[in-house]
Amino acid sequence: GPLTNIAALVLARPDLAGRIDDLTWMGGGAGTGNHTASAEFNAWADPEAVAIVLAHDLPLRMVDLEFCRKILCRPEEAERLRTLGGAHADLMADLFGGFIGIATRRGRPAMAFYDPAAAAAFVHPDLVTFEPVGITMELAGTATRGRTVVERRSHYMPFNAEIAAEA
């Protein structure tokens, strides 16, 4: 979600913020947005919070839209969970099925697993290749407010975050 709570912590209790050793965020995008043409929803919802987090050198790992859109789940994969048997497998199959249903009702064959992809990257960072980047938060643009501008060339700006590159 938006980084509002983390930004509030940084401003109110910088002593505690300094104890954060891994901040994995499902948000932002190196390309087009999903809420506006430029902005991913979680970045758009509170771009000032993202700017605060970036300005305070927290160890940010951004799991962005482009990465999440590669992590797809199809109806048959959700049903395969059910074959494992048991209440937990049935619950997960039902949850995944409902989530996938959002995509299929919109004519898509599969659903991108946005938040689950970020959760997996946090719990098992060995499953994801992260690369260092420089991120700037667009705060002023009329059409670009909320855009995370991702720079992969270190000679243009210092790297201040990492972005999920491959799973």
What does each model-found stretch correspond to?
Residues 2-75:
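Active-site histidine-anchored catalytic micro-motif
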Residues 44-48, 63-167:
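Conformational coupling and interaction surfaces
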